[in-house]
Amino acid sequence: MAKTLDSRIPEGPIAEKWTNYKAHQRLVNPKNKLKLDVIVVGTGLAGASAAASLAEMGFNVYNFCIQDSPRRAHSIAAQGGINAAKNYQNDGDSVYRLFYDTVKGGDYRAREANVYRLAEVSNAIIDQCVAQGVPFAREYGGMLANRSFGGAQVSRTFYAKGQTGQQLLLGAYSSLSRMVNTGKVKLFTRYEMEDVVIVDGRARGIIAKDLVSGKLVRFSANAVVIATGGYGNAYFLSTNAMGCNCTAAIQCYRKGAVMANPSYVQIHPTCIPVHGDKQSKLTLMSESLRNDGRIWVPKKLEDAKALQAGTKQGYEIPEEDRDYYLERRYPAFGNLVPRDVASRAAKERCDKGFGVNNTGLAVFLDFSESIQRLGIKEILQRYGNLFEMYEEITDVNPGKLAKKVNGVEYYHPMMIFPAIHYTMGGVWVDYELQTTIPGLFAIGECNFSDHGANRLGASALMQGLADGYFVLPYTIQNYLADQKLWARLSTDLPEFEAAEKAVEAEIDRLMNIKGKRSVDSIHKELGHIMWEHVGMGRTKEGLQEGLKLLKAIRKEFNENLFIPGTKEGLNIELDKAIHLRDFILMGELIAYDALHREESCGGHFREEHQTEEGEAKRDDENFFYVGCWEYQNNDESAPELIKEPLQYEIIKVQQRNYKN
């Protein structure tokens, strides 16, 4: 009999599910909360908001951060904004419209009930952040300003210039700091979770590594929450910070938490192109730029060749010789189509030879028209810090006038190209954000919950704060209300001792390989395999070859890795090696999932399954489910597939259309 997963979606109409859940869930008495401990791993938007909220409720929280400060979490890199259905613009937005756009943007591969709840709590997030003092942009009359993001025909994105993630994180950090000051949160900086401890079938603690001393430390709690972000760095080159890793999630997977839809990896269309083979990360240019920037390539192949050779500049190509291909193909949405659509369109143009830089892997993002229409002052007010960042990296100023012909001003365009950015897949969770391990919860990007096969722009911040501020504080109580869980466990239990010894033995194994290759050299090779075989365009043959190469690179890792130094004290290379071990396993999961899913949907594009127009072609008859993968004893064994059928009550599943 096939294994099944219980998503615990409440009964009743979709608009009433969350309300009914909150009305009937079990609660924990305020006095009893004082007796209960919760571990929260991660201090980004999801982790910081959850830790602060749970502590405010009375729980004792142990919060772990791999950086010197929670303010260095990768959430700080989010630029463009956060979605909410406030409808301040009176342009037709609503909770239902946000819900529908998110499900459609995810190519009908998300759970309806989870997405509706996300849209439902979105407005409360904005109120919470305003109360914290987040300096959202405002219109002349004082109302909060909005702009548009991809996959929407309304303006629902709230923003703080191009620094929205930073400002939201500072708001969450202020709440967290307040609870640290009261003693309700014990914050452990420069600590990394190395394993989850299971006692009587439940998550009851973690083994953490003090990254400064190198020592392993045991922590017990009544529940464990991981908020550790995505796995984009399995591709080596991505927009993720260098420290972003999937070790906590993968360790939970090894202990019995299933992974859901790992092949759903987002390629962001507006990133600064790769500049050389020594590069170690990529830089995101906010999707908000697509509000006022127009994406184009030359109409003539000879112009593209001249751009690639450096004998012609973008501003020298006249308007009539420019192909604004997104506006041409998708007139209803233009440059604001969803990210997967925009990325594939850019790849198609470059594959046809119309790329605009020396590698042929770039397209233009041009602000000439909007600067003339709105004025340079207004454009700089909206995107000034993004223009500065682009100039600092490329030495090109997108706001600088290049030439003027017959009254038409031509500015230096940006060059952009798609890159790995976000992961829609992640640890499987039910409606309560609980994994298949009782007592282990996963929130934010590290779970698979809300975005289906493609996330809409400005929805990552929304999900992280929704989970931390407004969902987990309810659902974790439903679990902790069980009085059998209230006893505090000693970290001297055999389960804790065995987990620590296993981590210690693995560290010793890695240190004693004593091969000839650095962590970075193997990681770079892994990234090349992932991008070439499991990247933007996937095929059956390419994925099969990718799996062979991934098994070979694990062998190379296990036999030829060299880690300098010792395991005692600070050893960044050792930490990176642990991350790389888990990226290899994650890469295999992505490839297995992509190979089994014989369809194209959202960020997962199988070249064998596309329409005549080159759009993603789903197979709803055979693949209308969440693909979940269960660990089988060791890293070498293929994982087992478990299917969670999707159930749609009110949205009609149909082919996505962004053309009209």
Regions found by a protein language model. Name each.
Residues 68-100, 266-270, 279-281:
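Conserved N-terminal glycine-rich FAD pyrophosphate-binding loop of Rossmann-like flavoproteins
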Residues 125-215, 227, 271-285:
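Conserved redox-cofactor binding core of oxidoreductases
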Residues 223-282, 451-474:
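Glycine-rich loop(s) and the adjacent beta-strand/alpha-helix scaffold that form part
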Residues 20, 25-37, 50-53, 57-59, ...:
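Glycine- and aromatic-enriched mobile tails/lids
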Residues 47:
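N-terminal Rossmann-fold NAD(P) dinucleotide-binding loop
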Residues 42-44:
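Glycine-rich Rossmann-fold phosphate-binding loop(s) that bind the pyrophosphate
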Residues 251, 257-400, 474-477:
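An anion/pyrophosphate-binding glycine-rich loop and adjacent beta-alpha core
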Residues 34-36, 214-223, 436:
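Core beta-strand elements of the Rossmann-like FAD/NAD(P) dinucleotide-binding domain
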